[in-house]
């Protein structure tokens, strides 16, 4: 691997020898790039080399295109092309497949006067075959420009294979783009079964007859810098293509959870587009609930009619990045959002600081209305994909745990409530490392304090602003609570 410093210090001949194979049998591009030094980054080098091609006359560009091999054939080609085609599966074609590729390539060459070119890295032989069929329908000028675009992509991949930017001291900039509100609905996804059952919840699985998800996709990588600085879209994956990619892969997903779907899509994105360095996917579930049905004089649950739920919703977040040939999950968590719970009594708030700024009265028994966002992380992210359903933690179970603890606890504060909810979740699911909370206090204001003949009261919405809390409950917290409970049990027995 070479660094930018290495390339900038080479003499012209050494640089030409080093970069001569980046463009197929066209070392003249590397030779001319020597005069454009210094190169500040891989993207800068790629931009300058492609700029040389763009500035060349039409005949020179056509000559460059014609130097590329015909995909899927056995004709002589450069070592780089051999390796790229083998990785795409073109080196192991069955005889019938080989003859099909040979025929289509000849048809393409006869139609346009130059070979079919495609940056095959990350693609399968099926992808290549489909692209060849589709592009046979194009106009010549469209294909001429597309051939150059594919050559630029190939050059980018080849540069990334031999150049490292490790050790460069420039600060990494924020640079990403993506697509939001990618709605996808799937019927008859594989059911989620075999989850661990807990005392606080009746949840036993999901039939997944109707599944909805709202996905946000954000990608990053140095390859996209020219699109910002120069308006060069050569390596840009259109956000509309991202939308199509996500929606169509919901059809081929064979798992049972949103977490697993995001993992599947992230890997497919990075496998397909090898110039992407990072991807962040957020999937918010769109829940559907089966409606009642009256069949054969009995009330049952419909297997056909579902109601979209407007209650709390679950969300999953996954971040992945490329490191060489390895894809690493850098962050993954699951979350239940906008869980709104009210407990009509058994809540207090007393003993807080009272000074000249205090107007809030102490209350030994009040209703408490809380909004909760609860997120959890696994020690092993593979557990979130439900390959072993018994180690998967469902949002429905977290919801039921939260309401159960709220019911059981004499609540002295929201802070104490979320602490005990978190400890209970970690006690039930030892595969989790921590549980985080974002909570808000939306307790109602009293309108009528006493109603004759009733213990009820009348309330209204609270005046803004609202109080909030952020807190993470750790595995250590849960262990401390477990020890305290054991000590209390021993003291009672004594």
Swiss-Prot record:
Give the EC number(s) under which this enzyme is classified. Answer: 4.1.1.97, 1.7.3.3
Associated pathway: Purine metabolism; urate degradation; (S)-allantoin from urate: step 1/3; Purine metabolism; urate degradation; (S)-allantoin from urate: step 3/3
For this chain, one GO molecular function annotation is: 2-oxo-4-hydroxy-4-carboxy-5-ureidoimidazoline decarboxylase activity
Sorted alphabetically, which keywords does the UniProt record give?
Decarboxylase, Lyase, Multifunctional enzyme, Oxidoreductase, Purine metabolism
Please report what switches on or represses expression of this protein.
Expression is very low in excess nitrogen (glutamate plus ammonia) and is induced by TnrA during imiting-nitrogen conditions (glutamate). Expression is further induced when allantoin or uric acid are added during limiting-nitrogen conditions.
Look up the signal peptide feature and give its range: none
Give the source's domain of life in one word. Bacteria
Q: Give the residues the record marks as binding urate.
A: 239-240, 349, 366, 414-415, 441
Entry similarity comment: In the N-terminal section; belongs to the OHCU decarboxylase family. In the C-terminal section; belongs to the uricase family.
Query: Can you say what this protein is called?
Result: Uric acid degradation bifunctional protein PucL
- State the taxonomy lineage: Bacteria, Bacillati, Bacillota, Bacilli, Bacillales
